[in-house]
A protein has these predicted regions:
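Extended catalytic cores of very large enzyme megasubunits
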Residues: 1-315
């Protein structure tokens, strides 16, 4: 027997059997070879590969994607192999791939880079080859054609161009096309100006959340919002300002996951003529040394006060 075929059968026969349960995923064939390496491979598997989201096929020996180091802002992702599954506790023991073991916290790992994780937190990619993703994309994009013949022709054209890397769709298309999920194919959305009212801000926030939940990034401009301390006549109060309202919208970024480790992306803007512009700029500063420099060297009392507020802020 051909040694290549023996290796193929040993490596992917089970996965192809699992794939039969997922009508949108194409099986691995012997002519597929594009897998990428390092970060490129992790991004492909984590963000674009079709997953068994219900874990119905998860078993020993499977390749999975997991968070190897927990962090509220910058969690480290990696790949690993399932060693055993505890159905009672809904956990799995995983040997983390060698290239990601350096990210693991020492207190979480056993000898040999073995970790225990809840099954719920694992992702099992079904598309290990770029050609599988290209086939799914081509099939999905060709569905708009009106006859079977035209659909087949479009499928072949899309697939050959994408496989040859002559045409690479945007990330949201790689993730969504042909997947049967109701996600967006657009990476970025530019929103209308935010209406200067509680109802208008709430509606804007709702739209941002909906776009992000379907995979899109959002740009919002808060220049239409009234400045900080402005009188709100209807309730005889004062506004907390454009920065506070836009910060609330920006926090959606940390709440909405978009598949794998990808979180929603936003660009929050404010015009340079807006009275809150200094507060806006300082709110984006992360380096304490810069804030201290501003406090110690700037003469403008408003700017110094804003820098002090930012430096001493504790969420």
């Amino acid at each position: 027997m051909d040694a290549t075929k023996t290796t193929f059968k040993a490596g992917f026969e089970k996965l192809n059997k699992d794939i039969e349960r997922f009508p949108h995923v194409f099986p691995i064939t012997e002519d597929m070879h594009i897998t990428y390496e390092g970060v490129s491979r992790l991004v492909m598997l984590d963000r674009y590969s079709y997953k068994d989201s219900t874990k119905e096929t998860l078993s020993e020996g499977d390749l999975v994607i997991l968070t190897v180091k927990e962090d509220p802002k910058y969690p480290a992702r990696g790949t690993g192999t399932i060693l055993s599954i505890n159905l009672k506790d809904q956990t799995a023991r995983i040997r983390v791939s060698a290239e990601y073991q350096h990210n693991i916290d020492d207190f979480e790992v056993e000898e040999g880079g073995i970790m225990t994780r809840r099954i719920l937190t694992l992702d099992k990619p079904l598309e290990l080859f770029y050609e599988q993703i290209a086939m799914r994309n081509a099939h999905g994009l060709a569905e708009v054609e009106i006859t079977p013949e035209l659909r087949h022709e479009a499928f072949l054209k899309f697939y050959e161009e994408q496989k040859a890397l002559n045409f690479i769709p945007a990330g949201r298309v790689l993730y969504g096309a042909g997947s049967g999920t109701d996600v967006t194919y657009f990476n970025c959305y530019v929103m209308p100006f935010v209406p200067d009212s509680r109802g208008g801000i709430s509606d804007h926030r709702k739209k941002v959340m909906e776009i992000m939940s379907r995979g899109g990034g959002v740009g919002s401009n808060g220049s239409t919002l009234r400045p900080r301390h402005t009188i709100v006549k209807g309730v005889n109060g004062r506004s907390s300002g454009s920065v506070s309202w836009m910060d609330d919208i920006a926090k959606l970024t940390h709440l909405v996951e978009q598949g794998g480790s990808r979180r929603g992306a936003q660009m929050i803007m404010l015009a340079d003529w807006h009275p809150d512009i200094f507060e806006f700029i300082i709110s984006k500063m992360q380096n304490p040394r810069i804030l201290r420099y501003i406090i110690e060297n700037f003469e403008d009392e408003q700017i110094r006060m804003l820098a002090k507020e930012k430096l001493h802020f504790k969420p």
